[in-house]
Amino acid sequence: IRDRFKNNLIMMDILANFDWKRSINFSSGGIYDSENLFYLNDYLQYDGFSYRLVPIKTPENNGDMGRVDAEDLYKVVKNYRWGNFKDLNTHFDETCTSNIISYRTSVSRAGIALALKGDKMKAKEILNLAEKEIPSQKYNDVRSLSSLVTTYIVAGDEQKGLQLANKLKKDIFKDYQYFKSLSPKYRLLSGELKKKPYEYSLVVEAVSEAYKMLGRKDDGYQYVVKSLEPIDKQYDNIIKDIQQLGKEKSYMKMDDIQNAVSYTHLT
């Protein structure tokens, strides 16, 4: 007890006297450490911007924490106050846009839960709502949009999901080539370059995971293989260049090899 912080002691007292008449909710921003939840990770229900303590055990699944009540979360999403993200002429700072991932995650998890229980109409409804209120053409964050890729496919709008995935992959390659073209004095931006293979893997995984949910593992495998083709092509072109340059000049191509190889990690 002596080593406990006051907030831990307060939480212990709340839990000791908890009678389930009023809910205990944990902020989405505070779940990064299990200690903050008193290691109750498996007894949570995802309610959008918070997690509610419930007497139902739900082990973490593919990185998603907590159970989802499809109808409850659908109502939460429908009652969101979205702000003014849909106005393309309005600029928001990073603090405001950081909430976008929570909005889209709510839509994704609600949409998947609805679709899996057979209510694909409601799933598509909130997907369209999210696109209307937070247009992907302006807010093209890969982390949050990749979750919507999965939801589109599971909800029966496969073409829209694949189109979004392909656009994200093209944008990632475009950004990758841009950062790679910068001179050495911009080394501080190398972190952005290293993010791109990870982002690419998120998109590919989003599609393959959707097919897995639908029992179409072969389609998921084929998509992964096809997504590796542009990477293999880039790698093959570099190898051919090296063979033509000879031993001495080939050392100048080593950075290109490392950049291409970094993408192979998504397998």
Residue ranges and their predicted role:
Residues 1-266:
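ER/secretory pathway lumenal C-terminal domains and tails of membrane proteins involved
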